[in-house]
Amino acid sequence: MTPKLVIYTDGACRGNPGPGGWGALLMYGDKKKEIMGGDLATTNNRMELMAAIQALEALNKPTKAELHTDSQYVMKGVTQWIHGWKAKGWKTADKSPVKNVDLWQRLDAARARHEVDWRWVKGHAGHVHNERADELARLGMLKTLGERGSGKAV
């Protein structure tokens, strides 16, 4: 049986807005890849979106993936809200511009290349892979700030 690609993503922010980071853990069978990054001036929602975007953009061919996020914003946005936003020219129900439209459009393009099964996971609930994605997001933020991380290899 062919293993499936499983992805866990998370974002972190010190202040909102403030410096932030994103992290993603990609697992295929017994192989793992960890990616992270950050921004000096951002929001938690932008970092949550970036984690999913970067994970999907890291895939070099169309892939069937299961993507786990602890962000209700990302989960509801990508599975419910995005269809209406696109139909209304990237406007909300009250005709105002969609917040973070640049990232939503990028996520929409990234997911179009793949077959993604979106899954919500409760954050900070002891789920080992989600906790690792959270740690990667914090490390991404620390690296962006030029601070020392936890000392764990990434």
From Swiss-Prot:
GO biological process: DNA replication, removal of RNA primer
Molecular function terms from GO: magnesium ion binding; nucleic acid binding; RNA-DNA hybrid ribonuclease activity
Cofactor note: Binds 1 Mg(2+) ion per subunit. May bind a second metal ion at a regulatory site, or after substrate binding.
Protein name: Ribonuclease H
NCBIfam families: PRK00203.1
Binding-site residues, Mg(2+) 1: D10, E48, D70
Role: Endonuclease that specifically degrades the RNA of RNA-DNA hybrids.
Enzyme class: hydrolase
Entry-linked SUPFAM superfamilies: Ribonuclease H-like
E.C. numbers: 3.1.26.4
Keyword Ligase attached: no
Quaternary structure and interacting proteins, as annotated: Monomer.
Location(s), subcellular: Cytoplasm
